[in-house]
């Protein structure tokens, strides 16, 4: 197969970096373009280490900048679109989330048509499927069951619209007469080294004498390791570039999980961190129903204050539901169509994440020493 190139949007992020680390090993790949709003110095340093393997071009730009997207897509064979604003606490303005996640995706699809990019892989999220109620139990859910989020909260709503746009664009005619092939991947909650959520959670615990907050003990979910999600993107890319596999994959979405045990978010956090002296808060937590209605009251207060004051409650009904539902999904369709098998076992993923958390603990101790002296 002739030489090809790939654009990864949001490539400086948690998942994007892992995708790029796997991409460099792909056969006949001549260039990786990485588009992000800004690249942190440590990310630039990591990418510089890959320059000896492949041409790696870093592009700083806005997903809403049409000229930027046009230039980034020109001469590209594949687009992997991971860029998005992730916000479950409603801390980011709704307009910002809708613009980046929906309009940005639409503009990128249009840029692909103009630049005749034939393959588009979209990083969606499990949140486009729900959960809609903490009372509803979904175990080993499958794609054909058509679960769909009913939330109007900006993050799940915007990701749902973005995914629909991507799958709806499948089959579009490209400027050169070719055809655009698309698919979407819906990963579960992603954990692993560099996770911004896990990092914030652990830093919060470090500032609380190593006590982990206990707000998600009623959940039962199947988190997925970041390395396995990245691997699923590589397999989707290969499949959409294979004329024999395209007919079954184009316009489809896939749940991406792995063999991480089904457990609560609290249990996952504790398992990954207990080696470093962390412990779960032993205090009683509020019943879910009470948490839910308290969140509803806080949302009403936020709404009433909105004309004169911007008040963001520390939690909301969507977050309470997300954190306390039985909501697990199977990866059998990805296994069948993409040939997906987890690249990392649970033991490997657990060990790598534990070691990273250990490095956070070490950094925290060094910071405290510096403050004392």
From Swiss-Prot:
Species this protein is from: Bos taurus (Bovine)
Pfam families for this protein: 3Beta_HSD
SUPFAM superfamilies according to UniProt: NAD(P)-binding Rossmann-fold domains
PANTHER family hit by this protein: BIFUNCTIONAL POLYMYXIN RESISTANCE PROTEIN ARNA, SHORT CHAIN DEHYDROGENASE_REDUCTASE FAMILY 42E, MEMBER 2
Keyword entries, A-Z: Endoplasmic reticulum, Isomerase, Membrane, Mitochondrion, Multifunctional enzyme, NAD, Oxidoreductase, Steroidogenesis, Transmembrane, Transmembrane helix
Active site as annotated: 155 (proton acceptor)
EC nos: 1.1.1.145, 5.3.3.1
Lipid bilayer topology: Single-pass membrane protein
GO BP of this protein: C21-steroid hormone metabolic process; steroid biosynthetic process
Lineage: Eukaryota, Metazoa, Chordata, Craniata, Vertebrata
Gene from which the chain derives: HSD3B
Family, as annotated: Belongs to the 3-beta-HSD family.
Catalytic activity: a 3beta-hydroxy-Delta(5)-steroid + NAD(+) = a 3-oxo-Delta(5)-steroid + NADH + H(+); a 3-oxo-Delta(5)-steroid = a 3-oxo-Delta(4)-steroid
Record-level GO cellular component terms: cytoplasm; intracellular membrane-bounded organelle; mitochondrial membrane; smooth endoplasmic reticulum membrane
Regions crossing the membrane: 288-308
Name of the molecule in the record: 3 beta-hydroxysteroid dehydrogenase/Delta 5-->4-isomerase
Function of the protein: 3-beta-HSD is a bifunctional enzyme, that catalyzes the oxidative conversion of Delta(5)-ene-3-beta-hydroxy steroid, and the oxidative conversion of ketosteroids. The 3-beta-HSD enzymatic system plays a crucial role in the biosynthesis of all classes of hormonal steroids.
Subcellular location: Endoplasmic reticulum membrane; Mitochondrion membrane
Binding site for NAD(+): 159
Major localization class: endoplasmic reticulum
GO MF entries: 3-beta-hydroxy-Delta5-steroid dehydrogenase (NAD+) activity; oxidoreductase activity, acting on the CH-OH group of donors, NAD or NADP as acceptor; steroid Delta-isomerase activity
Pathway assigned in UniProt: Lipid metabolism; steroid biosynthesis
């Amino acid at each position: 197969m002739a030489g090809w190139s790939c654009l990864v949007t949001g490539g400086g992020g948690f998942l994007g970096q892992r995708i790029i680390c796997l991409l460099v090993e792909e056969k006949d790949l001549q260039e990786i373009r990485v588009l992000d709003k800004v690249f942190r110095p440590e990310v630039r340093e990591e990418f510089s280490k890959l320059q000896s393997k492949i041409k790696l071009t870093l592009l700083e730009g806005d997903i809403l900048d049409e000229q930027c997207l046009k230039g980034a897509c020109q001469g590209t064979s594949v687009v992997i679109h991971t860029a998005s604003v992730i916000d479950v606490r409603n801390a980011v303005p709704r307009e910002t989330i809708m613009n980046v996640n929906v309009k940005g995706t639409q503009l990128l699809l249009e840029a692909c048509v103009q630049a005749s990019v034939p393959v588009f892989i979209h990083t969606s999220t499990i949140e486009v499927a729900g959960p809609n109620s903490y009372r509803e139990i979904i175990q080993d859910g499958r794609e054909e069951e058509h679960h769909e989020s009913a939330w109007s909260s900006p993050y799940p709503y915007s990701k749902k619209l973005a995914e629909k746009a991507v799958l709806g664009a499948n089959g579009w005619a490209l400027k050169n007469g070719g055809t655009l092939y698309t698919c979407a991947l819906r990963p579960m909650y992603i954990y692993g080294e560099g996770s911004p959520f896990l990092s914030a959670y652990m830093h919060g615990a470090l500032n609380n004498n190593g006590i982990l907050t206990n707000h998600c003990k009623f959940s039962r979910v199947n988190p997925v390791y970041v390395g396995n999600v990245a691997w699923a993107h590589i397999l989707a890319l290969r499949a959409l570039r294979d004329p024999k596999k395209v007919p079954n994959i184009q316009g489809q979405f896939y749940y991406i999980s792995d063999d991480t045990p089904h457990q609560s978010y609290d249990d996952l956090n504790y398992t990954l961190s207990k080696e470093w002296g962390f412990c779960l808060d032993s205090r009683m937590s509020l019943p879910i129903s009470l948490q839910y209605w308290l969140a509803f009251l806080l949302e009403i207060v936020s709404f009433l204050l909105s004309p004169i004051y911007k008040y963001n409650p520390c939690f909301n009904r969507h977050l309470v539901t997300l954190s306390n539902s039985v909501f697990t999904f199977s990866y059998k369709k990805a296994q069948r169509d993409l040939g997906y098998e987890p690249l990392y076992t649970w033991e490997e993923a657990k060990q790598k994440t534990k070691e990273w958390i250990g490095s956070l603990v070490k950094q925290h101790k060094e910071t405290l020493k510096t403050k004392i002296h």
